[in-house]
């Protein structure tokens, strides 16, 4: 792996060191999170195992477990897993790489990835191929990836004018993808796309700061929530913060 991969990994260790499970639960209760959490569970099966690859503090897994799903989690940030286990010892969590999952072919019924695969220089295809490998035929993939929205483009322009990298910095890598790129990537890696929707428009506004931010951990203001609801209707893609895709495995690709 590259030096940037290792630096990004360390950045996540530092991020999780400053976070807490209780605060992450507050994020899950925010309206913008319900745009995803209120939708994708209906596509998951309670008959098999659901993996969250890149689970962080595992609050999503705790929510799904309470809903009756059988869940496991994996992350390369050990500190986050230690914190999650201390909060909920019964969780099945494992340290590992999303590109080399320690699970057999065709063994899992669901694969969740929330804001993970965009952090790798080599793109999202290797991670999607590995997701395909471990899913059973007909298994469900749930994926969220940042979108190159209006605010993101403004930030890129600002960085370019300052002579900085437009995508990342020296310690943390992140990329964005259009809905067309994501659909093509899923189809290339053996998935049929069941759903592709823009989400979290209020959080795009949060990126502008000022009146769009409320006190608290990444909280959007009432103004951001109200305008975000309007933008979701009148300009769904230009102000999309993160695209949610749900796919079904229709052919086995593997690594």
Could you say what each language-model-derived stretch is?
Residues 58, 116, 199-201:
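Flexible loop residues that form catalytic
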């Amino acid at each position: 792996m590259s030096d940037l991969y290792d630096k990004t990994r360390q950045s996540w260790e530092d991020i999780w060191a400053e976070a807490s499970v209780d605060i992450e639960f507050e994020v899950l209760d925010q309206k913008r999170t319900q745009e995803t959490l209120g939708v994708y569970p209906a596509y998951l099966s309670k008959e098999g195992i659901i993996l969250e690859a890149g689970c962080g503090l595992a609050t999503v897994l705790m929510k799904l477990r309470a809903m009756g799903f059988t869940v496991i989690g994996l992350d390369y940030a050990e500190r986050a897993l230690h914190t999650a286990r201390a909060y909920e010892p019964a969780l099945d969590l494992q340290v590992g790489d999303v590109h080399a999952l320690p699970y057999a072919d065709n063994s899992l019924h669901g694969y969740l990835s929330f804001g993970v695969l965009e952090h790798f220089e080599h793109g999202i295809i290797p991670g999607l191929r590995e997701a395909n490998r471990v899913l059973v035929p007909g298994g469900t993939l749930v994926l969220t990836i940042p979108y190159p929205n209006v605010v993101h483009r403004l930030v890129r322009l600002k960085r370019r004018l300052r002579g900085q990298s437009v995508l990342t910095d020296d310690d943390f890598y992140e990329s964005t993808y259009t809905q067309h790129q994501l659909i093509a990537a899923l189809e290339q890696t053996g998935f049929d796309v069941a759903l592709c929707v823009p989400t979290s428009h209020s959080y795009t506004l949060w990126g502008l700061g000022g009146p769009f931010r409320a006190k608290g951990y990444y909280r959007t203001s009432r103004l951001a929530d109200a305008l975000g609801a309007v933008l979701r209707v009148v300009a769904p893609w230009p102000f999309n913060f993160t695209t949610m895709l749900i796919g079904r495995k229709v052919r086995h690709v593997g690594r």
